[in-house]
Structure formats: C-alpha cells, structure tokens
Amino acid sequence: MKKKITLIIVDFQKDFSNVIGKLSVKGADKARKAIIAFIKKNAEFIGEVIFTVDWHTANHCSFKSNGGIWPAHCVQYSEGAGVDDKILHLCIELGINMKFFIKGNDDSVEEYGAFEKMGTIMTIGNDHYSISANNHKNDCNITFESDKVVICGIAGDYCVKNTIANLIKYKSPTGLTLDVNVLLDGIASIDDGTTIKEYCKENSLPIVEAKEYKYLKG
C-alpha cells in the first residue's frame, strides 16, 4: 500500500493570491491552477493538506507602519487573511483532510518559515510517521502524518523557501528525515522564481510539476 502524501500549501491567502490583495504576488493565478490540478490528479493519495497561514495583528513588526519592510497584510480576521477560496472549496468537495497552522502572530517576530519548532518524528507501524510542530508563540500545534511531503505556495523567495528549510534540516534522534518534494509550478514568487529554483538546486531537492507528477512509489 502506498503511503499518503502530506501536501503543504504555504500562505496561499487572499492578500497574496488576489490581484487586489494588500501584498499581491505576481504569478499567483498560475500557481493556483497548478495546485488545483495537482490535487485533482492525486486526490486519492493525499492524506492531508496543511495550510500555513500568516496571522498578524495590526502591530506586527514586519509592517512599514511599524518600521518593517512590508505593507500591512493578512491581519487577523480580515478578508485578506482568508485562505484562497478555490483551493479550499476543492479540498472540501473532495473530502480531503485539512489542517491549518497559524504563524506570524507574535508581533515581535518575523516568522517566514512555518516549522522552525519541530518536534520528534515518531514511527507508527512500519511506514507511518507523526511529526509535531509548534509556532513561535507556542499557541498553535500541528501534527502531520506522512514523511512524504509536497510543498507549494507563496512566496517562493520568502515563506516557501524558509518553510522548506525548516523541513529539510530536521532529523529525528534515530535518523529519520522527511522526503520533501517541491511543486515548482505551484509556487508564486516576488522575484522571478530564481531564488527558489537555486535553493532547490543547492539542496538537491526533487522538483515536480503538476502536469507531470506521478505519485512516488511507496
């Protein structure tokens, strides 16, 4: 039996993914289409979708009004902080298990990478893993249940890259690591995509595309 995939969708929120968003990222529409195509093609093998979510207060240090470099975005409970409707509704329609991981809710911390505080990888049975992670503020805990990870989202040169870095640096005390695959056409970047491509190359990460992806052998 094949292992299920954990699909991690980083910060695909309306302030980033919509053209009228507070911090709209070019290429988000193309990335959305690729993610939707991937989910439809691999739905039976996707055990869960984890949405990471920027969840700032109006006082967050990253905002220009507070001395940061970004316009205010993804403010808690605002429309712009909402997860992209089309992807969310597809997961609901297909009955895919969804989890949401809040980050960036500590006003004093710029939290690009979602999983900086990962716990122990626990083996359950012969081929099943349970990995826990906390956010920086320790008020959100999540467990993802597969060592086969496909990651995509916004923005490739910031939150996606740093979240990948969190995942690939982790090794359990017994030497277990995660099988991280990058859904490149499901990523939108503030730059032209060079940063995420070079990062994947430097770290020998498998790059996949929605149109050609075939589920890895179990």
Each model region followed by its residue ranges:
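Glycine-rich N-terminal loop/short-helix segment of MobA-like nucleotidyltransferase
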Residues: D15-V25
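Active-site-adjacent betaalpha module
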Residues: K2-I8, Q13-S17, K30-F45, T57-G218
